[in-house]
C-alpha cells in the first residue's frame, strides 16, 4: 500500500508547478517539434541537420516493378544435377531410357544454368537453358530437350 502523497497536492494553486515560466513546460513546440518535424520542403527549420545527417530524408529514388510483371524463375545448375543424380533417380525425376539417363527438370525448375560440370552424358529436359549449360551438356556427350 503506497502512502506517499502526490507532489501535485503540494503544488495546488501554483501557477507553474515548479517549471519556472509557463512556456517552458509546453509540448513539442518548445523543443522545435517532435522527431523529424520541421525537416520538410517548406521553412527548413532543421535543414542543416537534415543535409548533414539524413541527406536521403527527402525525395524519391528508384521504383518497384508491378507484381504482375515480376517473374520468379526457378533455376537448377548442372552441378546440382550431377551431384544429386542418384536422389533424382530415386524420386522419379530422372529415369533410364534406352541406356541413357533422362533428367526431367520441368517438375522442379524453369531454367538450367551452366554452373559446374557434368561427369557423364545426360539427356536433360527443361523449359529453358542458358547458352553455357547447353554447351556443357553437349560437350559431355549429352542431349538437350526443350519442353
Curated annotation (Swiss-Prot):
Pfam families, alphabetized: Ribosomal_L27A
Biased composition (Basic residues): 1-28
The keyword Amino-acid biosynthesis is annotated on this UniProt entry: no
UniProt keyword list: Ribonucleoprotein, Ribosomal protein, RNA-binding, rRNA-binding
Region (Disordered): 1-43
Biased composition, class Gly residues, residue ranges: 29-38
One GO-annotated biological process of the protein: translation
Molecular function in Gene Ontology: rRNA binding; structural constituent of ribosome
Superkingdom per UniProt: Archaea
An example Gene Ontology CC term for this record: cytosolic large ribosomal subunit
Coiled-coil positions: none
Binding partners and assembly: Part of the 50S ribosomal subunit.
Family: Belongs to the universal ribosomal protein uL15 family.
Function: Binds to the 23S rRNA.
HAMAP family to which the protein is assigned, alphabetical: Ribosomal_uL15 (MF_01341)
Record protein name field: Large ribosomal subunit protein uL15
Organism: Pyrococcus horikoshii (strain ATCC 700860 / DSM 12428 / JCM 9974 / NBRC 100139 / OT-3)
Amino acid at each position: 500500500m503506497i502512502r506517499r502523497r502526490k507532489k501535485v497536492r503540494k503544488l495546488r494553486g501554483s501557477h507553474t508547478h515548479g517549471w519556472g515560466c509557463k512556456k517552458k513546460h509546453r509540448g513539442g513546440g518548445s523543443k522545435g517539434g517532435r522527431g523529424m518535424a520541421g525537416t520538410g520542403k517548406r521553412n527548413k527549420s532543421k535543414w542543416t541537420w537534415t543535409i548533414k545527417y539524413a541527406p536521403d530524408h527527402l525525395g524519391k529514388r528508384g521504383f518497384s516493378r508491378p507484381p504482375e510483371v515480376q517473374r520468379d524463375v526457378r533455376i537448377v545448375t548442372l552441378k546440382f544435377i550431377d551431384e544429386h543424380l542418384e536422389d533424382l533417380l530415386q524420386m522419379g525425376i530422372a529415369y533410364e531410357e534406352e541406356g541413357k539417363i533422362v533428367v526431367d527438370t520441368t517438375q522442379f525448375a524453369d531454367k538450367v544454368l551452366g554452373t559446374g560440370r557434368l561427369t557423364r552424358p545426360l539427356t536433360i529436359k527443361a523449359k529453358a537453358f542458358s547458352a553455357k549449360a547447353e554447351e556443357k551438356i553437349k560437350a559431355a556427350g549429352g542431349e538437350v530437350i526443350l519442353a
